[in-house]
Amino acid sequence: MTATPADRPDPGVAGDADWAAEARPLLVHADMRLCKRFDQGEPTERLLALRARAVDQLMRNAWARCIPADARLSLHAVGGYGRGELFPRSDVDLLVLGETAAQQRHEQALARLFALLWDVGLPISHAVRSPAQCTSAAADQTVLTALIESRPLVADAQARAALAAAIAPQQVWPPRAFFQAKREELHARHQRFGDTADNLEPDIKDGPGGLRDLQTLGWMALRAFGVKDLEALVGLGHVGMDEAAALRREREELARLRYGLHLVANRPEERLRFDYQKTLAERLGFADDPESLGVEKMMQRFYRSAALIRRISDRLLQRFEEQFDGEAVPVQLDAGFSLRRGYLTADADTWPDGDVVQVFALFAQWAAHREVRGLHSLTARALAEVLRDLPAYDVADAIARDRFMALLRGPRAVETLNRMARLGVLGQWIPAFASVSGRMQFDLFHVYTVDQHTLMVLRNIALFAAGRADERFSITHEVWPRLRKPELLLLAGLFHDIAKGRGGDHSELGAVDARAFCLAHRLSEGDTELVTWLVEQHLRMSVTAQKQDISDPEVIHRFATLVGTRERLDYLYLLTCADIAGTSPKLWNAWKDRLLADLYFAARRALREGLEHPPPREERLREARESARTLMQAQGHDDATIDRQFAGMPDENFLRFRPEQLAWQAASLIEVQIGQTLVKARRAVPDNDALEVFVYSPDRDGLFSAIVATLDRKGYGIHRARVLDAPHDAIFDVFEVLPQDSSADGDPQRLAAALRQVLAGDLLKVRPSRRAVPRQLRHFRFAPRVEFSESAGGRRTRISLVAPDRPGLLADVAHVLRMQHLRVHDARIATFGERAEDQFQITDEHDRPLPDAARQALRDALCACLDPT
């Protein structure tokens, strides 16, 4: 912007509108030119400076237009604008400096200035202060932070000196206090984001490893050492040239992301939301290929940048701390290692370049001494310098491999693996792990990057070992002690997803990697086979439990045959629990815990009794009745009452439910007469939100649909529904539900009362409620898929439905089934992020499987209901 309307004589306030009308397109055209240069790949750092310079000129011209030359006021850029970095949609922060009398004398002129700048289209944020007011306001360190980066726009030497004196360390916030405050602020900010950058929609600016971390280091350096950028600290010995270069490189990466994000969002957006990720990836040139989406590549680049920034930032913060506190007297540990102010140090004369054995010795020391706060900054830097020279396991010697296995078998093994991953050592030792580092999957199911998910799985395994997982995992503490070698489970967890992103079946490819690793580390053939099998089959137990009917003896027989041994079952069960719970904080719940435990016990029994002769149906019925009878007798019920209740329950009931469920159902039925309706609800697990709902009712058109719609309206998500025919034309409905949103209060009595009220009315008038699709789900739409097959020996039709998830989905499906006059006998509801994968066993109104014509009509109706377009 080399010429603005302000270059002409000021015609007064009356001409401001014309001036703004001419200045506005100049600013727009300047942004358009910068946008074009951005798309051509020009360094973002230069574009930010050019945009700030363009706004500078407009500011000076507007100031000259509105403020008299003798006003004794000065104009300063502060904050990011003061740094000379102005992103496309960022606020323009200004400080007007002058004594109170001058402020009051020119109050109208200042108001005119700010109005004019807003009319031009600049999102200004301004403060008008005297030097003394600056000192007072700077008692808030966030205000001081903005002021220490001030840059004069219209100010003489006297004004600049006055501002510098007002916020000098002698006046407010000496360097040590400022450092401590900023470090605490950084820690609190990280905690707001769960102390990880690996979120699905990370914050480029404020998240861990984001631009704000780099700015924080810069503010500390400016206050403590008086330098304008981190590169200047190289000469002072506080930052290495390699570290400064790495931070500059990663700053450019993040700045480019943020610049592009402002452009595609057309607002000051700082989060990489799903709304913008694909568009931004395309704009930045990240293209899809057979193995990865472009958006996944872009996000991986971001996650890796954030991780590196955090590693270097941790080192610099420690060095700044030492600058203020001085060197501490070392406390000697084992030969070659010591503690300095709680930080583990490898002595310089014992640190051999590229010696991975010595690196593993460092981590062994860390694991052996709980008092260690972390690595000393000099040791961490030395490790970073030799990192690329460390050999991978397949070219390292046997001693190094043995040392790694010793770490895996030693105390705090999972903590050690986490540290090795964070510092880049694990990816160097296992290159396949480096390949998945920072790799995200563009869906709502996997909320962590592959490497972070892997580490979450390992942490869950550590909880099993410590016995602290009992609240969430009902039987892991019973199974864990049976493990012959816990390190084999850790290896399976480490490799289970390591082949993601290569194309092909990641379970099979990962099994190949796991086998090679085990053989290289001299594991026995039996141990190698176990780890390989676990990696290859790590999804099998989850799929069986969630997508098949585990009350079906054929399902149990197939699964137990695949597993083959009790040892494999123990390892697979623990790996499955750790995997599901480590995929998303919301994925693991009481129903999944119970489902996997039921499958575990059923498979264990099948293995114990022999796979050749599974127990016949009559024997299973007898055992279930006897177990339920024992429980009811303990509750004070006599045999006559028990027999009467059992007679009113379908045989299928005794094959599908656990004894304690059968006892609860039978005891509940004592209250009801033939032809009446009963609704009961209870907590399935004490101190848990999971509820079990039992409905006994005469068979009525629309019963299932009305129950499902009511549960949905009350904010409950259905995880399983079973519908059984009972004597006297009655229906048994059993639902396993969990609160899904804030409208569900979790009270079983209130839920049962609400259902009774609905079932007492006209069921055909109950309609699914309509709710908006959440923002995140709107970005993962795909065409629904409906498939049919036979079930129950050809007596029923199975529908397998895959569709984009949304609120009220199941209620809509149930309504379609009712409108088609179909009966639901079983429903399995599974949600995997944005995907709903549901199965229903149905018949027509005469209890017959669906012919082809009826199937096609149902498919059309379901697709019309579920199609996101």
Curated annotation (Swiss-Prot):
Region of interest (Uridylyltransferase), ranges: 1-332
Q: What PROSITE patterns does the entry give? A: ACT, HD
Which chemical reaction does it catalyze?
[protein-PII]-L-tyrosine + UTP = [protein-PII]-uridylyl-L-tyrosine + diphosphate; [protein-PII]-uridylyl-L-tyrosine + H2O = [protein-PII]-L-tyrosine + UMP + H(+)
User: What are the annotated disulfide bridges?
Assistant: none
Query: What cofactors does this protein use?
Result: Mg(2+)
Alphabetically sorted, this entry's keywords are:
Hydrolase, Magnesium, Multifunctional enzyme, Nucleotidyltransferase, Repeat, Transferase
Provide any one GO MF term from the record: [protein-PII] uridylyltransferase activity
What sequence ranges are listed for the domain HD? 450-572
Entry's Gene Ontology BP terms:
regulation of nitrogen utilization
Q: What is its EC number?
A: 2.7.7.59, 3.1.4.-
Q: Where is the ACT domain?
A: 692-771, 798-869
How is this protein's activity kept under control? Uridylyltransferase (UTase) activity is inhibited by glutamine, while glutamine activates uridylyl-removing (UR) activity.
Keyword S-adenosyl-L-methionine appears in the UniProt entry: no
Looking up SUPFAM superfamilies in the UniProt record yields: ACT-like (SSF55021), HD-domain/PDEase-like (SSF109604), Nucleotidyltransferase (SSF81301), Nucleotidyltransferase substrate binding subunit/domain (SSF81593)
List the PANTHER family hit by this protein, alphabetically.
BIFUNCTIONAL URIDYLYLTRANSFERASE/URIDYLYL-REMOVING ENZYME, BIFUNCTIONAL URIDYLYLTRANSFERASE_URIDYLYL-REMOVING ENZYME
Write out the function statement from the record.
Modifies, by uridylylation and deuridylylation, the PII regulatory proteins (GlnB and homologs), in response to the nitrogen status of the cell that GlnD senses through the glutamine level. Under low glutamine levels, catalyzes the conversion of the PII proteins and UTP to PII-UMP and PPi, while under higher glutamine levels, GlnD hydrolyzes PII-UMP to PII and UMP (deuridylylation). Thus, controls uridylylation state and activity of the PII proteins, and plays an important role in the regulation of nitrogen assimilation and metabolism.
Q: What is known of its domains?
A: Has four distinct domains: an N-terminal nucleotidyltransferase (NT) domain responsible for UTase activity, a central HD domain that encodes UR activity, and two C-terminal ACT domains that seem to have a role in glutamine sensing.
Protein family (similarity comment): Belongs to the GlnD family.
Q: State the protein's name.
A: Bifunctional uridylyltransferase/uridylyl-removing enzyme
